[in-house]
Amino acid sequence: SVCRILEGCWNYSFIMGSKYGGTRSGTQWNQSFWSKEKASNFARKKDISELDYLEVDQNLLPWDDQADGAIQDAQDDVREILKRPILNLQGMSNADIKLNYGIANFEILSACDQNYTRLIRALNQWGEALYQSEKLADAESIFSYALDIGSDISSTYITLGKIYAQTDRIEQIQPLIERVKKQDFFMRDTVIDKLTGIVRSYQ
């Protein structure tokens, strides 16, 4: 997935920076990284049948057979993704996956993780399309479900906050902010600022 590619780029830049910077902490990190990476490439295959694969109750999603345009496209994307095995491995590095489940399972688990990333993106696109069409209740159900399965997409949080404000439920934004504070993703502080701004604008 994109996350896996970015991880590799980050690891490379960190290692190169450590190499030419000559810091002790960088050298230690470099040694630790390669030691873990080497060990992971010899990890034995393990049973992955009992992992917490995502099972989506499709009755929770506001399907609309009469939809067209962006809404229909997003629905179709979600339907297609739900035909595949989905697993949220956010927070695990490539080496972590191989060490925990064996290098022989790495390709299939990476695909499952990529399916998860595709799903939360498709759900966000679906929710945004519904929001733009002023179908706020349906958009809210999509965004809420996406967060329940662990989405870290910033616009999922922010647009849900906008819906709360537009439907005079501003008090529900603070719990949403507290939820964001417990997460660890790149745009966390930006999301908190945006949600706080929505509250201030409402008052």
What are these regions (language model features)?
Residues S155-T156, D189-V191:
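TPR alpha-solenoid repeat register
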